[in-house]
Amino acid sequence: MSDELDTIVAADNDKYMIRCENLVKIYKTSDVEVVALQGLDLDVERGELMAIVGNSGSGKSTLLNMLGGLDKPSAGNLYVDGKDLLKFTDKDYMEYKRNTVGFVWQNNARNLVPYLTAVQNVELPMLLNGEHKRRQKALELLDRVGLLKRKNSRLDQMSGGEHCDLV
């Protein structure tokens, strides 16, 4: 992380991986304002498993987009790993998305590059992040999810379940 990003740390959030305080998201068009999220308070402790469930239009995707750095809150406080996302610059968001969070779309086809092999798909984010020993790390990850034998397979040679495991 950059020195700039390290200075955007909330003092009392060491206990929490995610903390939302009175979080608000308003989408605006020329004529209409839609309140997608209003006054959300949420604490997720480190190591805690959390499921976000709710009716259609209840703000689940809005919250996840903000946690994933794909959208910015309109008001309130949002901390991830002790960092205050409301103070992020565009550069901070880029670094955050590369090093802190991952976002997996429901449609796996959007998460993978079809003409690359399984191992190349795993290596791609590491390449963009400048990591060394990418091939070794990619092979270890494929082994962990039981896909080492499919390392040289392209997506059209793999099942839907294998796509999910690969993502």
Where are the regions that the model predicts?
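A short, flexible loop at the N-terminus of ABC-type nucleotide-binding domains that lies
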Residues: 13-20, 26-39
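Conserved ABC ATPase "signature" region
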Residues: 19, 83-84, 131-150
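ABC ATPase NBD coupling module
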Residues: 31-32, 85-102, 128
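The feature captures the beta-strand-to-loop junction immediately N-terminal to the Walker
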Residues: 53-55
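Helix-to-loop junction immediately C-terminal to a conserved catalytic motif
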Residues: 68
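Conserved ABC transporter NBD signature motif
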Residues: 76-84
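Short coil-to-helix segment of the ABC ATPase nucleotide-binding domain corresponding to the Q-loop/switch region
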Residues: 114-123
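Conserved ABC ATPase signature
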Residues: 154-164
